[in-house]
Amino acid sequence: MKPTPSRYVAPSLFSGLEDMLDMNHPLSKLAAKIDWQTFEDAFTPLYCPDNGRPSTPIRLMAGLLILKHVRNISDESIVEQWAENAYYQYFCGMQQFCAMQPCAASELVHFRHRIGESGVELILQESIRVNDEDEPHHSGRGRKPEAETTAFIDSTVQEKNITFPTDCKLLLKAVDYCHKAAAEENIRLRQTYRKEIKKLKRVMRFRGKAKSKKIVAKADRRLRTIAGRLVRELLRNLPPESPWLPRLEIALKFVNGEKIDGHKIYSLHEPEVVCIAKGKDRVKYEFGNKVSIVRTQSGLIIGALSFRNEYDGHTIDRSLEQIRRIYPHPINLLAGDRGYRGQSSSGDTKVVIPDNPQSTDSPYKKRKKHALFRKRAGIEPIIGHLKTDHRLSRNFYKGLFGDSINVMLSAAAFNFKRAMRAQIGRAHV
């Protein structure tokens, strides 16, 4: 049921939060700049009007979601810290200090699924509007500056919260699924293979030792055979409504060497994960999905979109479509690195990449191109901040939906923190 609006505030013997707190604090100023009514109007129709318990206020849930990514903490931690931090409570619309937790951590999960990708994109759009209000929209002669119509694009990998995948590790996990499913469903297995698996683990422990290649390969083949037998036996005996069926079907595909959507299975609980090789010396392979980030010359992120493992040049059109939805100014020039070669334009937007200067280019034009691509390199540290400060380095949300919303929430948190810094100059927030 939709939340009940509070029309009456009981008088208190003590001062309210607005009287207690410093209204020049960055969180206080950010709370005043955000148009919370936009979220109320967009999310209220998603609740049932006359059935069920009244829900937690929309501003509270949206504020918790923003604070989680701004402060880079988990659902459980933001709920705990909210009860201890008066500025968090004021940011979420509270008028009196509350010493209790506002909700269960699982309610944030339900709220994210309720608002969906479009709701998270609305939060990103509001973060752009908050920053766009402070930007100069014309030069001294009344013309729009190029900073509004020029953008830079780059891609990075959003790693999923999985361990490094190996066949041995995933086969053992499939066997563990089988043992747990049999215990929960009261199915008696013909053979559990527990003793044999223990011996195989001992053999596979010395995988990197000399003269052990053949015996370890033999143990791998035997483990795959055991996993296949157990999975097929359980699939035959499990009832149709068992919650274990989807997981065991994925496990059977892995045991048989099948693929999902054209790629191998690297995780049994996150089968959509793909392997991406970006040519890094530090990390040869990354397991997750590709994301596209677009920023303006002033450092404002105006586009954040999730993909699978497409070629960089094929992400331009969809990224610009998102920008047209959430950014109020048209993008006339989009600069990328050499990974975006192959596409020179998208609609009214010209796409440029670093290249050898033409013989007809004047020295002024060469200097201008050089300055543009030097400015483009500034997107790299922004991606670094998204990963280290706003939860883009490790995606804890589940499935393709989690891939999509995590990158947008990280970008929105970066923009909100940028607006907070603007209130206090270059001091640390």
Question: What kind of feature is each model-predicted range?
Answer:
Residues 280-326:
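Electropositive, glycine- and tryptophan-enriched low-complexity nucleic-acid-binding patches
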Residues 27-66, 70:
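Basic, short loop/linker segments at the boundary and entry of helix-turn-helix/winged-helix-like folds
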Residues 332-401, 405:
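Helix-centered, glycine/charged polyanion-binding patches within enzymatic domains
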Residues 25, 62-64, 78-82, 104-108, ...:
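Short, conserved catalytic/metal-binding motifs centered on acidic residues
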Residues 95-272:
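Active-site- or DNA-interface-adjacent structural scaffold in DNA-acting proteins
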Residues 46-58, 72-113, 120, 139:
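Trp/Phe/Arg-rich N-terminal binding region typifying the photolyase-homology
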Residues 1-34, 41, 421-426:
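Charged, often Cys/His-bearing segments associated with DNA-binding zinc-finger transcription factors
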